[in-house]
Amino acid sequence: FAVSEVQISETETPLHRLEMVYRRAMEGLSTADCFLGAFRSVLDGWFYGLEEDVLAEGAGADETTLARRSDELLEQRLAEITRATPQFAAALRAYRAAQRAGDHATAEGLAGWLSGQPNVAASIKRAAGVKGDVDHFAALSFLRGLLLILKDSGFSGLALVLDEIETLQRVRGDV
């Protein structure tokens, strides 16, 4: 399992602001290999797994064939994500293209946008063909996209702990 804990509070991470809950969950994402901040590790591991699957098919070891077959496999696996969240899929494609091109700043920005970070440069979002920030409505779709990536990467799922103890301590007991 991948695991994440989100501290729910009235001011910093209210439960009704799903975009904030999603962002905090991605910031605290942990796996067995990476304690905190495993979001990029999960993405990179998923793309690596695609290439490993292509190599296991025996599709050829030259770079051009590997890249072409990896792109085809990427599109097959992104089909479900694309139907649910086209922006998530577009940003994943652009992230991979930036990684391949050695454009680490764009890749970093897109990983930030995919994880719900609000202050990503417009030029980076434009490179992926996406607009705006991850909002309340997109947050659950993005979470669904992450779950598909986790499943495809061999994880059993995501254990998400929503800790509301701070909020509950302020609730009046005499009501």
Which sequence ranges carry the predicted segments?
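P-loop NTPase nucleotide-binding core
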Residues: 1-153
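Conserved P-loop NTPase "ATPase switch" module shared by AAA+ and STAND
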Residues: 154-174
